[in-house]
Amino acid sequence: MPKTSKDVIEFAKKNNILFYDFRFTDIKGIWHHVSYHADSVSEDILKGVPFDGSSIAAWQPINQSDMLLIPDLDSLFIDPFTADPTLVVFCDVYDIYKKQPYEKDPRSIAKKALKYLAESGIGDAAYFGPENEFFIFDDLKIKDEINAQSYEIDSTEGVWRS
């Protein structure tokens, strides 16, 4: 994989990449992204992609909303599901006002936790991942009439069954 910004540009050209998709998650785990056409991506932008942090719920006030996405060049891959060849790059969020990684960025939080784990000696490894929560319904009845709408859910896992 490419290790420098110059290598990334060359890799993209060799693979006929049309778009770069810079991705990050908010504190709630929701994916966000900023996309650029390949013609507008330079080595400089791969050092920091500007974006408006006030557009992310509970992140930044409008008067201090300028933030940077710092691409993690070890994470890039060509997205197999896009119609046009797209290079995906996961990013760390950087607070330009405090000149440090953003404290609400899940990647920054995980890196701090790993650093603490190593420095304190309380553990050798940490594993992070999403927690998938869902319910399985055994039956669903829907009523949708001009004068009434309702639904009824039944599940062997429901509290009304215990």
Language model: regions and residue ranges:
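Glycine-rich, acidic/polar active-site loops that bind/position phosphate-bearing ligands
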Residues: 1-162
